[in-house]
Amino acid sequence: MIENLTPQQAWDLMQQNTDAVLVDVRTKVEHAFVGHPIGAVHIAWKEAPDWQVNAQFVTDVKKHVQDRNAPVLLLCRSGQRSVDAAKALEEAGYQRLINIIDGFEGSLDSLNHRGNLGGWRFSGLPWVQS
């Protein structure tokens, strides 16, 4: 089952459960230039320019999360790629999958800008830019 949590709820869970692993599934460019949560493991679900699913995604996650009962929190830009990545992990036997609603940047606002309506960064949670 895939659970949905707000960024704040996800942060709270990570503070309470040291087995929890946050996986940032965005591209290398997003991760480096837009910023990323401190402590997140970066494993892209899809990568530009062809936007094909990373065939090594599940294998790469297994390197960081051996316990399939540990909470695995997934984050993308706005919450869609992370759901797809969570489904792949669910098929691989992971039991505690958490999609972070609104991702890192949140939904588009009325001016088609991200970062003003929600997401990890908007919530004031720890993040850095490379």
Q: Where do the protein language model's features map onto the residues?
A:
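Rhodanese-like catalytic fold shared by cysteine-dependent sulfurtransferases
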Residues: 1-21, 28-71, 82-130
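Short, surface-exposed ligand- or partner-binding patches at beta-edge/loop junctions that are enriched
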Residues: 75
